[in-house]
């Protein structure tokens, strides 16, 4: 997914491989008995070997794909807490790309929702969460609630320059047509000021429940989504819409709360 954008901007892609020793060494409560420690040590050794082999394989695949696309690239291998490492590295990179259904392999992170929430709470943003299979981005749907965080998200997206040739639609959910018209007009003006013409749409109902079906009906390839203000207070980082998308969306997500 990132190859076309990287080629267009001459960007460098950095592949991050993280080994978490604490996770690999955890074997659960151990009963007392002869041979238990040896068995646990053997299990840890097997895990370490498997992870090392998988990292090497993934790194070679990443490098091969980058070379084929003529994209600058390098691989960084780190040891430690994946969240702390990601939070540190994001200071020196423009964007983080993670899997939509799992950020790290080998069961390092059990829940994608909690993992993304923790990453964003530590300042890892923007995040492009993608599926397992490559999907060309031909149509981009921006969900705009009118909140400050929602506006920040689409502003991040515009400034990134991603998918500049893809048609963009900004949709607002809610029952107040006048409020929707005002917000959509201002959002469209921001896009226009940065050289991007967008179409807008107002839908009744709620983004929490209707955004995914709307995106699929419009045949969107990417959803740009932020928060609602009330849910920001309740969830601190993610609103209900973002959490629902992370759990259920079959489409790639651009998140920058």
Predicted regions, residues:
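Gly/Ser-rich helix-loop-strand patches that form or flank binding pockets
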Residues: 75, 83-134, 214-257
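Generic structural signal for helix capping and beta-alpha/helix-loop junctions
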Residues: 23-25, 83, 107, 137, ...
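Aromatic/hydrophobic pocket-lining residues that form π-stacking "cages" and hydrophobic walls in ligand
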Residues: 2, 62, 86, 187, ...
């Amino acid at each position: 997914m990132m190859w076309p954008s990287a080629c267009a901007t001459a960007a460098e892609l950095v592949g991050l491989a993280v080994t978490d020793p604490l996770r690999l060494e955890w074997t659960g409560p151990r009963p007392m008995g002869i041979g238990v420690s040896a068995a646990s040590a053997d299990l840890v050794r097997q895990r370490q070997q498997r992870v090392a082999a998988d990292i090497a394989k993934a790194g070679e695949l990443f490098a091969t794909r980058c070379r084929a696309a003529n994209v600058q690239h390098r691989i960084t291998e780190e040891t430690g807490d994946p969240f702390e490492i990601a939070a540190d590295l994001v200071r020196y990179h423009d964007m983080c790309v993670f899997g939509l259904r799992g950020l790290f392999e080998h069961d390092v992170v059990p829940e994608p929702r909690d993992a993304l929430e923790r990453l964003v709470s530590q300042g890892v943003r923007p995040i492009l969460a993608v599926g397992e299979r490559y999907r060309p981005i031909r149509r981009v749907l921006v969900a705009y609630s009118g909140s400050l965080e929602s506006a920040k998200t689409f502003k991040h997206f515009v400034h990134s320059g991603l998918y500049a040739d893809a048609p963009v639609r900004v949709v607002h959910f809610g029952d107040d047509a006048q409020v929707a018209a005002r917000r959509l007009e201002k959002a469209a003006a921001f896009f226009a000021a940065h050289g991007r013409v967008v179409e807008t749409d107002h839908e009744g109902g709620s983004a929490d429940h209707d955004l995914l079906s709307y995106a699929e009906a419009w045949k969107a390839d990417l959803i740009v989504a932020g928060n609602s203000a009330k849910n920001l207070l309740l969830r601190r980082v993610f609103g209900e819409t973002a959490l629902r998308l992370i759990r259920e969306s079959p489409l790639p997500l651009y998140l920058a709360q």
